[in-house]
A protein has these predicted regions:
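NAD(P)-dependent short-chain dehydrogenase/reductase
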Residues: 126, 132, 136-200, 205-214, ...
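N-terminal Rossmann-like NAD(P)+-binding domain of SDR-like oxidoreductases, especially those catalyzing
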Residues: 1-160, 299, 303
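C-terminal substrate-binding subdomain of Rossmann-fold SDR/epimerase-dehydratase oxidoreductases
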Residues: 185-189, 193-309
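Generic anion/oxyanion-binding catalytic loop in active/binding sites
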Residues: 51, 73, 80, 88, ...
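Short secondary-structure boundary/capping segments
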Residues: 3, 42-43, 181-182, 219-220
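Conserved alpha-helical elements of sugar-nucleotide-dependent glycosyltransferases
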Residues: 20-23, 98, 172, 176, ...
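Structural element of the ATP-grasp superfamily
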Residues: 102, 138, 180, 280-282
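Residues in well-ordered alpha-helical elements
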Residues: 60-63, 82, 89, 100, ...
């Protein structure tokens, strides 16, 4: 992306110190971009990136950060399903109002934007509701204000460096892959909410990062691209994921655990089917290059085995 008369390429990544964010930053750096990371507190970004302290809820700091960028990938947000149901306001303020601040700044400076959204946008939990709201605002900005904005609906991203929840890590949000792997590696049974028939689409985090950057480049070249779905299209039940993890942990460590079922958590659907359509990735030319689930689980088990040592 050519900068505004400066001859450099600079991308701002909000939430660039998060799980997907760090991979997106590394992908950008690998392609030769100058990268700034917008974060609320000091955390060392990926090597080669510049940290910009700021909160997306603060329109002034967002506008200032965007004014120095040639492109924006917006990932910052408050996560959680059952964790945010009893107190949705913080997530709504950050995800919706903060997201609007990012959209307004990008529209003001005519900067191409890629906004991350969720595959389960129809679910009645705070995260899905707030992320879908911003996705709708993107559509409004594109249609009525001529903004160069594209949505990437990320399905269930997983991989090394994903933060585990207690007792294995500091995350307040329990994610399926680190939870399953950490429990299995420590000899604890894998816990599944519901009967495990829920269908998910697991996508390796490096593939998500590649899609985000490719979407930004295409938006810069050709304008708004509508919606890309960052998913493999592979229908995998939660039970399938658990048994793949059990098998891989047994292969790498010799430890064998069982799978147990618990009641469903609030905010989740026992019969959910959340699948991406990789055909949407055709314009990016990467739909058939996604890492198979078995290979991604093997890489993830290797990482968490070292993490837990």
């Amino acid at each position: 992306m050519a900068a505004k008369g400066r001859g450099v390429k600079t991308v701002l990544v909000s939430g660039g110190n998060g799980f997907i964010g760090r991979y997106a930053v590394e992908e950008l750096l690998g392609r030769g971009y100058d990268v700034s990371v917008l974060d609320t507190r000091y955390r060392e970004p990926a090597k080669g990136a510049t940290l910009v302290l700021g909160d997306i809820r603060d329109a002034t700091s967002v506008t200032e950060a965007v004014s120095h960028a040639d492109g924006v990938i917006h990932l910052a947000g408050v996560l959680g399903t059952q964790e945010t149901i009893k107190n949705p306001r913080p997530a709504a303020e950050t995800n919706i109002l903060g997201g609007l601040n990012v959209l307004e700044a990008c529209a003001q400076y005519d900067v191409p934007l890629v906004n991350i959204a969720v595959g389960n946008y129809w679910m009645n939990n705070t995260y899905s509701i707030t992320k879908n709201t911003v996705e709708r605002f993107v559509e409004m900005f594109v249609r009525f204000r001529g903004s160069r904005m594209t949505v990437v609906r990320a399905l269930n991203a997983y991989g090394p460096r994903q933060t585990a929840a207690a007792p294995f890590g500091p995350s307040k949000v329990r994610k399926v892959m680190p939870s399953f792997i950490c429990r299995a590696l420590t000899g604890e049974n894998i816990e599944i909410y519901g009967d495990g028939s829920q269908i998910m689409d697991m996508i390796y985090v490096e593939d998500v990062a590649n899609i985000l950057v490719a979407a930004l480049e295409k938006t810069d070249r050709d304008g708004s691209q509508g919606t890309f779905e960052a998913g493999t299209g592979r229908r995998t039940t939660v039970n399938d994921i658990a048994h793949l993890v059990v098998a891989e942990v047994a292969r790498q460590s010799g430890r064998v655990v069982n799978v147990v079922h618990l009641p469903m958590r609030p905010g989740e659907d026992a019969n959910s089917i959340v699948i991406g359509d990789p055909v949407t990735l055709g314009p990016l030319g990467i739909g058939e290059l996604l890492l198979p689930l078995e290979a991604g689980i093997a890489k993830s088990v290797e990482y968490f085995a070292e993490y837990l040592r």
